[in-house]
Amino acid sequence: MDSGRDFLTLHGLQDDPDLQALLKGSQLLKVKSSSWRRERFYKLQEDCKTIWQESRKVMRSPESQLFSIEDIQEVRMGHRTEGLEKFARDIPEDRCFSIVFKDQRNTLDLIAPSPADAQHWVQGLRKIIHHSGSMDQRQKLQHWIHSCLRKADKNKDNKMNFKELKDFLKELNIQVDDGYARKIFRECDHSQTDSLEDEEIETFYKMLTQRAEIDRAFEEAAGSAETLSVERLVTFLQHQQREEEAGPALALSLIERYEPSETAKAQRQMTKDGFLMYLLSADGNAFSLAHRRVYQDMDQPLSHYLVSSSHNTYLLEDQLTGPSSTEAYIRALCKGCRCLELDCWDGPNQEPIIYHGYTFTSKILFCDVLRAIRDYAFKASPYPVILSLENHCSLEQQRVMARHLRAILGPILLDQPLDGVTTSLPSPEQLKGKILLKGKKLGGLLPAGGENGSEATDVSDEVEAAEMEDEAVRSQVQHKPKEDKLKLVPELSDMIIYCKSVHFGGFSSPGTSGQAFYEMASFSESRALRLLQESGNGFVRHNVSCLSRIYPAGWRTDSSNYSPVEMWNGGCQIVALNFQTPGPEMDVYLGCFQDNGGCGYVLKPAFLRDPNTTFNSRALTQGPWWRPERLRVRIISGQQLPKVNKNKNSIVDPKVIVEIHGVGRDTGSRQTAVITNNGFNPRWDMEFEFEVTVPDLALVRFMVEDYDSSSKNDFIGQSTIPWNSLKQGYRHVHLLSKNGDQHPSATLFVKISIQD
């Protein structure tokens, strides 16, 4: 039952000095502010999955002193967070490190007593994170069940009595009556000692993890045989899984990768265990493995792609009083975001700052944001990053901005047109590794010829920060003086190349735009919807050659989001959402952008790239987009659905909702029945059917909720998959948390078929 030792042995880490130091634990200084540094004891638990942290808070529960390593986004060495940058400059960098979490909880900033101690923690945690990520689904399940066994074994005798068995089932998110639990217990208690140990626990584990629905799928593929031959596996891959590459080569490759039995592997056969391993793997995922890499043509103009874009990137919470943070930029970039917003204002000491103007959100230095962007811009994707500058600065501080941009970003800043690219937008491939600026500009594509100190020129002020559409919002913000014109210095203007901000002047004639290809208009969501309703096809044609940026309405002071789908249907590329706000809109957004290798650029369908297209999502007619398809989805079962309420006695009552997002006529949803008191292995076996007319614009969202008869259902997990990335046959849907992070073992087992 020692899951930690199993983990260390599995990965050859049992004698690793870094992990031995973490298992022993050490005193570290926790840093919260310039006046708050406290010594606390931190220790890796024996399960190698959790860290125990000492707390001096009164009445704090033991569970609240633990955090899971699965919740860690990354471990940073040195002064690499705002906290350590501000509050630990007096401490050498080689003693400082930070634990950054996946969700939006505060970063844990720590100071070790020596550089060696800091190295143990940083390297040890990185090793566990790396090896946990490389575990297959079976290993993750085994590790998780063993850790639940450890928790249930209250007296630590490596045996399990009946009460401990009941506690164990609760840990696994299963509620069973005493009679059924007693029946399982007796079946496994071969020694009749009223406790389970060693092989008896192993027998119990096998009974628990047996999946009848996998057995049925295996029998469907293998017939009466005990194993799957290469020929049978090829037939299964062709007829059930609809694999385009189905053939002996693929079958042998799957046997080689997933078959645990060396004997079966030598005989070129797949056992039931190997079959399950395949179905739980990336090859058995409902999301196409081929789409996990960049596979689309990246040599087309930028306007031909949807671009993952963030609104008010600097905010961690709401738009009126929430904190601004460089960490928000890092999080967005790590999620593949390629267009960030910088709302720039005059700051003290001649240093420009970023915050949500005329509100009480906190302020961060422009230069600090640039350093964070420089360090993280190309970690998740090599393709270009666009910085959307909302410039409200004085002339002097604009010059400071220009100096910082050149000094900090250096050669990665695009500050002149690419050779020969002066008649259309360059491609993502041409702009790889480059940062572009979007903002107000004097003159056209080429620099206006100004030198430092030359005369500034009036341009119209940025409008978005001032857009307060709702009276309730206006009453909550500080007084904003009326200011229609902004003076712009040439040093900053000349850095704007392919993304010159302009006011939209309307469509000059059907199918054409009055804008130059390097000019870019921004639209509030309400104005964009109005344009889509009144001139849907005109908007689509405009977006063939020009970039359009959409941002949330001014009344969304809570940082809520709008649906991006309608904007994408109109060909709009830079559809900016509040990345800090989880919810269905962000689920769909991140689902769309996991396509094409998660690089932040998704090629629009051909009919949204054709300058002569007649497509209009609000008035559908026949055309190349009209490809009716029928989707059948059978929701078979769920696996290891996480507890919503951490209360030990709470067991989830899950139900599954399948949604289609796309053009209006294709949108719909269906839901399963509720399974009571079982989050470990609920079974539904319910089939749904959807008719979709424009599959190129459709996404399928699988959502699991915990049903509550007296209040709103609680969200458990979801996965959103673009239609063209959806795989057919028996598949596992791997569920994500509300923040878009992978649940380690939570899946839905489904059967999918798509027919013309």
UniProtKB/Swiss-Prot annotation:
Residues 492-609 form the PI-PLC Y-box domain. The modification Phosphothreonine is found at T457. Residues 140-175, 176-211 form the EF-hand domain. Residues 30-57 are annotated as: Substrate binding. The active site is at H311, H356. Glycans are attached at S191, T193. InterPro entries: C2_dom (IPR000008), C2_domain_sf (IPR035892), EF-hand-dom_pair (IPR011992), EF_Hand_1_Ca_BS (IPR018247), EF_hand_dom (IPR002048), PH-like_dom_sf (IPR011993), PH_domain (IPR001849), PI-PLC_fam (IPR001192). The keyword S-adenosyl-L-methionine does not apply. Its EC number is 3.1.4.11. Residues 609-737 form the C2 domain. Its cofactor is Ca(2+). Ca(2+) 5 binds at D706, Y707, D708. Ca(2+) 1 binds at D153, N155, D157, K159, E164. Residues 21-130 form the PH domain. GO terms for molecular function: calcium ion binding; calcium-dependent phospholipid binding; enzyme binding; GTPase activating protein binding; inositol 1,4,5 trisphosphate binding; phosphatidylinositol-4,5-bisphosphate 5-phosphatase activity; phosphatidylinositol-4,5-bisphosphate binding; phosphatidylinositol-4,5-bisphosphate phospholipase C activity. Changing F360A: Lowers activity 4-fold. Ca(2+) 4 binds at I651, D653, N677. Ca(2+) 2 binds at D189, S191, T193, S195, E200. Ca(2+) 3 binds at N312, E341, D343, E390. Keywords: Calcium, Glycoprotein, Hydrolase, Lipid degradation, Lipid metabolism, Metal-binding, Phosphoprotein, Repeat, Transducer. GO terms for cellular component: cytoplasm; cytosol; mitochondrial membrane; plasma membrane. The production of the second messenger molecules diacylglycerol (DAG) and inositol 1,4,5-trisphosphate (IP3) is mediated by activated phosphatidylinositol-specific phospholipase C enzymes. Essential for trophoblast and placental development. Binds phosphatidylinositol 4,5-bisphosphate. Interacts with TGM2. This is 1-phosphatidylinositol 4,5-bisphosphate phosphodiesterase delta-1.
